[in-house]
Design a protein with these regions (language model features):
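Juxtamembrane interfacial secondary-structure elements that flank transmembrane helices
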Residues: 59-76, 99, 103-113, 144-154, ...
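Substrate-agnostic recognition of the 12-TM MFS/MFS-like secondary transporter fold
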Residues: 87-90, 146-169, 255-257, 277-280, ...
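N-terminal membrane topogenesis motif
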Residues: 1-28, 43, 66-67, 74, ...
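Interfacial helix-capping/hinge residues at the ends of transmembrane alpha-helices
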Residues: 30-31, 66-67, 146-153, 161, ...
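Helix-loop junctions and terminal segments of transmembrane helices
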Residues: 59-77, 154, 283-305
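Transmembrane helix-loop junction
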Residues: 35, 71, 154, 180-181, ...
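Signature of the first transmembrane helix
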Residues: 2-63, 93-115, 134, 138, ...
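Membrane-interface helix-loop junctions in multi-pass transport and translocation proteins
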Residues: 32-46, 121-133, 155-163, 167-218, ...
Length: 305
């Protein structure tokens, strides 16, 4: 228990430091980016592409399993393999959710009502469709990261996670700045930045587990608990029940947190979405810095004790 508490303290410090650096980088990048692109592009890129099309399918399908990883026994081989099997099982579901989100955004493109501001460029429909395709690729890369991420999460490797997330945010910000400020790219820059944000953790986690930890997390049957037991099992009942409960909770939480974003994305204009994004990013920065890492590590501690 003392080791778990020490890991929790280190985890809170690491995640808060990583979050602080990440938010500082994001804030600086957003200030510079907003001068290069208009409110309409900012609203569509941040709200539709980042929050809904990229993060939406991922949060809906993976958050329950990530929380279940905190409650798993890292020393139990079958429990660890159950986590890996579930992540591979959920991968097609995540892709299906992404396709459904993309279809909804395709048939309901961004609404541009206020066209009197000549300095605020409207979102091009062809660029918007290409950006959706790029975002789909980013979702696929993020899905391939999940098997190794949940293993790191179950083993409380918060230091590793903090470093990887910090470099991922840095890569995303630098990509956004280069594409918008130097190449004058608009909506597609958000999608390409998400590809960078998903690619860095994909390479980092897999390299760590293959090269350093010497294991390759792949789906395979669990080890039999009794001699002579031939029936193949791919997931323990306890892990399946725990993940189902957390999945349901994460679905409710996501709908409560993002209900207004969904309505604004499909009903509001892109200019209104841009104003909302600026206010939302600044208003929630303290909560994300202080309370989110503490909440996450509290769940990990209570699940392990």
């Amino acid at each position: 228990q003392e080791k778990i508490l020490q890991s929790t303290r280190r985890g809170v410090a690491s995640l808060m430091s990583s979050a602080a650096i990440g938010k500082l980088l994001n804030f600086t990048a957003n200030v510079l980016i907003t001068r290069s692109i208009g409110r309409k592009v900012l609203g569509t890129g941040s709200l539709r592409l980042d929050d809904l099309l990229f993060l939406g399918p991922l949060v809906l399908t993976r958050e329950g399993l990530r929380r279940a990883a905190y409650r798993s026994n890292a020393s139990n081989v079958n429990t660890q393999q159950s986590l890996v099997n579930l992540t591979w099982l959920v991968a097609p579901v995540t892709v299906l959710f992404a396709l459904l989100f993309a279809y909804g955004m395709y048939i309901w493109p961004p609404v541009d009502i206020t066209k009197d501001d000549t300095k605020d460029v409207n979102v091009g429909l062809a660029e918007y469709h290409r950006a959706m395709l790029y975002t789909g690729l980013a979702v696929l890369l993020a899905v391939l990261t999940e098997p190794v991420f949940v293993l790191a999460q179950s083993q409380l490797r918060t230091g590793l996670r903090a470093k990887i997330e910090m470099f991922a945010v840095l890569g995303k910000c630098l990509t956004m700045l280069y594409l918008t400020v130097y190449l004058n790219m608009s909506i597609e820059a958000f999608a390409i930045a998400n590809i960078t944000y998903a690619f860095i953790p994909l390479c980092s986690y897999w390299c760590f587990f293959i090269c350093i930890d010497k294991q390759f997390p792949r789906p395979k049957p669990l080890q039999p608990q009794e001699p002579g037991h031939r029936e193949e099992q791919w997931c323990t009942q306890e892990m399946r029940s725990t993940a189902t409960v957390f999945w349901w909770q994460s679905l409710q939480k996501w709908l409560l947190e993002n209900g207004e974003k969904i309505v604004l994305a499909f009903v509001g204009t892109t200019s209104q979405q841009g104003v909302y994004v600026v206010v939302d990013r600044l208003g929630s920065i303290v909560v994300r810095l202080l309370f989110q890492p503490a909440e996450e590590m509290s769940l990990a501690t209570l699940g392990k004790l």
